Amino acid sequence: MEITIEMIKELRERTGAGVMEAKKALEEANGDMEKAVTILREKGVIKAAKKAGRVAKEGIIEAYIHTGDKLGVLVEINCETDFVARTDEFRKLAKDIALQIAGMNPQYVSKEDVPPEVIEKEKEIYRTQLRNEGKPEHVIEKIIEGKLEKFYEEVCLLEQPFVRNPEIKVKDLITEAISKLGENIVVRRFARFVVGEE
C-alpha cells in the first residue's frame, strides 16, 4: 500500500512522532493507522526506557486547590531541562497528575516507595482471609500476588488507572510524555491536604 503525505500527517498529529518515524511505522503497518500508532507507542516505550536513567533535576511544583477550598495538592515533577519544564505539555502533565492525586488519594508515588512492613501486613491480611475462605495452601501465594497488584493500583500513584482515561495507568501517561518531550520525567513527591484531616 502506498503511504501518502496525508497519512503521515495524521499519524504525526495523533502521536507527535517525527516525519520519518511516522512513515516507517505506516510502512511497517501496511498503511493501517491503528497498527502504526501501536508500533510508535512501543518504540516510544523503548525511547522512554533509555531516558529513564538520565538525571531529572529541573521541573515544577504544581498546586491544585479543589472548589470549596477544602482539598489541596502539591506535586513536584522533575525533568532534565528548564526549557521542557516551561512547555505547555509538561505543565498539562503536572496539572493532570495533581488532579489524579486529588481525586484518587494515592499514598505513595511508586511500588518501591511502599514500606516492606506495609506489604507484609497486607499479605498477612490476605493470607488470613483466604484461609478463612478455605482456599488450598498451594494457591494462596498466587492469589496474594494478584491481590497485591490491586493494592498497588489503589495506593501507588504510578500504578493507578488515569482518571481521564482509565485504559492507561499514570505511569503510561508519563511514558508518553517522555516520548513526546524527549526527556526523563519523574514524579518526585506529593502532598494532599484535606481540611480537618490529621
Curated annotation (Swiss-Prot):
Region of interest: Involved in Mg(2+) ion dislocation from EF-Tu: 81-84
Gene3D superfamilies xref list: 1.10.286.20, DNA helicase RuvA subunit, C-terminal domain (1.10.8.10), Elongation factor Ts, dimerisation domain (3.30.479.20)
One GO cellular component term: cytoplasm
Any one Gene Ontology BP term: translational elongation
Principal subcellular localization: cytoplasm
GO molecular function, one term: translation elongation factor activity
Subcellular localization: Cytoplasm
UniProt key word Protein biosynthesis: yes
Cystine residue pairs: none
Family: Belongs to the EF-Ts family.
Function field: Associates with the EF-Tu.GDP complex and induces the exchange of GDP to GTP. It remains bound to the aminoacyl-tRNA.EF-Tu.GTP complex up to the GTP hydrolysis stage on the ribosome.
HAMAP family per record: EF_Ts (MF_00050)
Protein name: Elongation factor Ts
Taxon lineage: Bacteria, Pseudomonadati, Dictyoglomota, Dictyoglomia, Dictyoglomales
Encoding gene, per UniProt annotation: tsf
